[in-house]
Amino acid sequence: MTVPSRGETPGPPAQDRLTHIDEAGAARMVDVSGKDVTARTARASGRVLVSPRVVELLRGEGVPKGDALATARIAGIMGAKRTPDLIPLCHPLSVSGVKLDLSVADDAVEILATVKTTDRTGVEMEALTAVSVAALTVIDMVKAVDKGAVITDVRVEEKTGGKSGDWSRS
């Protein structure tokens, strides 16, 4: 812990600080050059609440625009790979794998993304972006039938690897 100079107020402990904000309060990209390259994985999930008619179509003949789940799966994979282009302070990473699982529940399309890398920082944002882009694509694919579809519950479920170790929501 750094001892503050006279007249300065000590800041919060490092684990209580926002890493993307510098001492002056300006946004910055965190320097990860000193971190070890390790295997890292993140899983994120989300749901798109849809009408009973959309559920019926997805389980049967499909929606008018085409294969909604296959299109959303590919969009989610593309989203994970483009995360640093969308999230300003995200590091470009060597994403080594992205898996998207989409399933039709009684009232929603459920989305689960798993992203893997061997790099200096985690892939939580890539997993969240994969879920978000897949969910947006589901909305685009079903909007002709259900203009009231809702994206909800987008969240990280677990992460492994890195200095902070493993974490799981459960």
UniProtKB/Swiss-Prot annotation:
Its EC number is 4.6.1.17. GO terms for biological process: Mo-molybdopterin cofactor biosynthetic process. It is an enzyme of class 4 (lyase). It holds the Pfam family MoaC. Pathway: Cofactor biosynthesis; molybdopterin biosynthesis. The active site is at D140. The keyword tRNA-binding does not apply. One of its GO terms (molecular function) is cyclic pyranopterin monophosphate synthase activity. Keywords: Lyase, Molybdenum cofactor biosynthesis. InterPro entries: MoaC (IPR023045), MoaC_bact/euk (IPR047594), MoaC_sf (IPR036522), MoCo_biosynth_MoaA/MoaC (IPR050105), Mopterin_CF_biosynth-C_dom (IPR002820). Substrate binds at L89, C90, H91, M125, E126. SUPFAM superfamilies: Molybdenum cofactor biosynthesis protein C, MoaC. It catalyses: (8S)-3',8-cyclo-7,8-dihydroguanosine 5'-triphosphate = cyclic pyranopterin phosphate + diphosphate. Homohexamer; trimer of dimers. Catalyzes the conversion of (8S)-3',8-cyclo-7,8-dihydroguanosine 5'-triphosphate to cyclic pyranopterin monophosphate (cPMP). Belongs to the MoaC family. This is Cyclic pyranopterin monophosphate synthase. It comes from Streptomyces avermitilis (strain ATCC 31267 / DSM 46492 / JCM 5070 / NBRC 14893 / NCIMB 12804 / NRRL 8165 / MA-4680). The gene is moaC.
